[in-house]
Amino acid sequence: ITLDHPPLNSVSKRMMVEMMRALDEFEQNDVVRAIMVKANGPDFSYGADGGDVKKGINGEAEEISESFSVLGNRLVERIDCCPKPTLVAAKGRCIGGSTAMFNAFDIRIVGEGFRMHDGDIYYGTVGSWGMSSLRLPMWIGRNKVLDYMFLNEDFTGRQCYELGLASEVVADELVEVVGLATAKKMSKA
């Protein structure tokens, strides 16, 4: 699966629905033994598509934002509970809701230039997909999350690896190659 929503690979409602359809297809296909997700362009994803979140400012924005959040949570849960092994090969920036999506994969290969940043922390909002407030403390511990939140810093690819948020760090130009090789290994396991 390739994220391809230029210029920033923003996560739109359409992208989420298409990803869930692809996951459904792959799960039903006995030939598919592992599922890999990558992104077109220099960055994995800049998170939620502002246009999808803000549509209908005149009274319906809250409802649309809520439905966007519900769909995002469903996608993250869908990836996390996929019965087939999943892998993400990511480089560049990974911001906001895409951090929750990224961390839902079983295996996470990142480039040396990878940067993960929770946009909700920057804007002072509660993470709609549960990344900073729910999932991250379970994985890296409360104190590290507080550092991340209060200092508003990115996690580098190396830090993600050291904290267990990434399975492997490779040169940016090798992310997809290593991801594909790893997916092939996964499909034989």
Task: Specify the residue positions occupied by each region the protein language model found.
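Conserved CoA-thioester-binding segment of acyl-CoA-metabolizing enzymes
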Residues: 1-40
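Hydrophobic, secondary-structure "cap" segments at the distal end of domains
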Residues: 133-143
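Glycine- (often His-adjacent) and acidic-residue-rich active-site loop
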Residues: 18, 38-78, 94, 124
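Alpha-helical segments flanking ligand/cofactor-binding loops in enzyme cores
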Residues: 77, 99-100, 134, 146, ...
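Well-ordered beta-strand positions
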Residues: 106-107, 147, 151-153, 159, ...
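C-terminal long alpha-helix characteristic of the crotonase
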Residues: 109-114, 166-189
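Hydrophobic/aromatic residues within transmembrane alpha-helices
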Residues: 37, 49, 101-103, 160
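Glycine-rich beta-to-alpha active-site loop
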Residues: 73-123
